[in-house]
Amino acid sequence: MTVTPRTGSRIEELLARSGRFFIPGEISADLRTVTRRGGRDGDVFYRDRWSHDKVVRSTHGVNCTGSCSWKIYVKDDIITWETQETDYPSVGPDRPEYEPRGCPRGAAFSWYTYSPTRVRHPYARGVLVEMYREAKARLGDPVAAWADIQADPRRRRRYQRARGKGGLVRVSWAEATEMIAAAHVHTISTYGPDRVAGFSPIPAMSMVSHAAGSRFVELIGGVMTSFYDWYADLPVASPQVFGDQTDVPESGDWWDVVWQCASVLLTYPNSRQLGTAEELLAHIDGPAADLLGRTVSELRRADPLTAATRYVDTFDLRGRATLYLTYWTAGDTRNRGREMLAFAQTYRSTDVAPPRGETPDFLPVVLEFAATVDPEAGRRLLSGYRVPIAALCNALTEAALPYAHTVAAVCRTGDMMGELFWTVVPYVTMTIVAVGSWWRYRYDKFGWTTRSSQLYESRLLRIASPMFHFGILVVIVGHGIGLVIPQSWTQAAGLSEGAYHVQAVVLGSIAGITTLAGVTLLIYRRRTRGPVFMATTVNDKVMYLVLVAAIVAGLGATALGSGVVGEAYNYRETVSVWFRSVWVLQPRGDLMAEAPLYYQIHVLIGLALFALWPFTRLVHAFSAPIGYLFRPYIIYRSREELVLTRPRRRGW
């Protein structure tokens, strides 16, 4: 072994070597390392505590539904510890994700499993067991033995008073079930089956156990009570304060219940329709539930024959309020078959056969699919036809039909109205810009460029105008790159997403601040210079306010979306895709509806600015002398300077 000598002084070497008297271990020849053996005994406990041979997926069943997935760490077939599993499939960007799964009870399940107090045998009150065995030996019949005990008030009071005082003894499973059966038979034969009441010990119990017990009570004619009918503790506050009905569903389940209820109400009226809808409505509340409840109330008041004929007149005999979604977009053309095929393929992709009795685009069928089979795929189908669904709602509302409330409830699920807004408003803005610009040029050509204020004041203008115009040009170019060029293109060019956003934030912030400073000076000039202020129209004043708001909102979106303040957000995956989809006439309003609020505010202000554009002095942008850059050369002949008796006056 080659030893590297130390380069320190003699005193330093002596001090280093003297350390062997104080530090246990072997010092290397170069005095640079110390090797110790042992001293890690304290780590053994932790290594053994968290060691395991394998990891299995399981759940726990201590007063629980067993719906939470746990990772169970096992060593030598013994549970050592457990952690929550987090690989639940996503429900998609349009729906609330599952609430966190796993509670402290589950985290301590191994304690329950190996607890010395774990119940491993059937137990019964010792006093009652003695009386039952004596009566059965004397009478020879289990039911007669139980009846004999109940007929004697003294013996009955004796075992009842023993409750809560211990005195439990082990009994066999056969004897325990025999005593339970004898008690049920005696109670039913003496008082009737309705004197037998069943309930769950806690709402969060095994669904198999609850189903078996409730089915047994129903088969013998007993009464199945709800958990809140007897459990007078904290959970009762939930239904009293929030209006929840017994067990509370997750937020995502509310949409499923609304879709299921709407599917029931939009089908042909039958005797079970309203009862099923009311049963579903018992589990949800809120505006959507109120709308569905209004439909149920109006149909409940109507005569069955009247409701049936009104349904036929509304949906079967009139195309203006049809429930077949593709008819709204394709009409009676061959394209409708192609669109219906998309519905059928969606159903088959989830291993569900398309309906045979109805076409796959029938709205109740789509709602049923979204509620019970694949919420994400159903959500996409409903979002793709949000405009026809909104038109159907308007048609039913104009006709004052009760089904309008149901369709309105469907529109409220998720952000369908928001999707419709971001689908329609861009085209409304484009129409205003096109028609308004034509009108302005046709009827106000003189005012197109004559409202310039350059003649009134030029000192501030020479400073503010370049700042604003050069800044806004950089902002426009940046918006064009971010909105028009797909993210995949910049990545293919070797520009990573992180590098792109850094450049966008830096350059965009500088350009935005420059633009804001320039427009601030322009507004100050217009307000403080009398002639300039007099030449400013009301529309221009509103335009300046909207313009400043758009710039401020853009700077805010840049800061918030970049992660400088708050969590970073990649707008190129939603806002940019929405922008491009608008121009190819395939608007994805759902993407814009998913964007954060600060992006929505910025885009909304921008659309308002474009809507004001034709009616303000911003139209001078259309008169920019672009042709001046490509003008032909002008040939002229120089002339000798004239000798005058007095200096020439400047022309400006």
UniProtKB/Swiss-Prot annotation:
Residues given in the record as heme b 2 binding sites: H479, H602
A family per Pfam: Nitrate_red_gam
Nitrate reductase delta subunit as annotated region, ranges: 258-415
4Fe-4S Mo/W bis-MGD-type domain boundaries: 53-117
GO terms of molecular function: 4 iron, 4 sulfur cluster binding; metal ion binding; nitrate reductase activity; unfolded protein binding
Binding site residues for Mo-bis(molybdopterin guanine dinucleotide): D233
Cellular localisation: Cell membrane
Record-annotated membrane-spanning stretches: 416-436, 466-486, 504-524, 545-565, 595-615
UniProt topology in membrane: Multi-pass membrane protein
Sequence positions that bind heme b 1: H469, H620
Any Gene Ontology CC annotation: plasma membrane
PROSITE patterns on file: 4FE4S_MOW_BIS_MGD, MOLYBDOPTERIN_PROK_1
Binding-site positions, [4Fe-4S] cluster: H60, C64, C68, C103
Record keywords, A-Z: 4Fe-4S, Cell membrane, Electron transport, Heme, Iron, Iron-sulfur, Membrane, Metal-binding, Molybdenum, Nitrate assimilation, Oxidoreductase, Transmembrane, Transmembrane helix, Transport
Family annotation (InterPro entries): DMSO/NO3_reduct_chaperone (IPR020945), Heme-iron_electron_transfer (IPR051936), Mopterin_OxRdtase (IPR006656), Mopterin_OxRdtase_4Fe-4S_dom (IPR006963), MopterinOxRdtase_cofactor_BS (IPR027467), NarG-like_domain (IPR023234), NarG-like_sf (IPR036197), Nitrate_red_gam (IPR003816)
Function in brief: Does not seem to have nitrate reductase activity.
Protein name: Nitrate reductase-like protein NarX
Gene source species: Mycobacterium tuberculosis (strain ATCC 25618 / H37Rv)
Lineage: Bacteria, Bacillati, Actinomycetota, Actinomycetes, Mycobacteriales
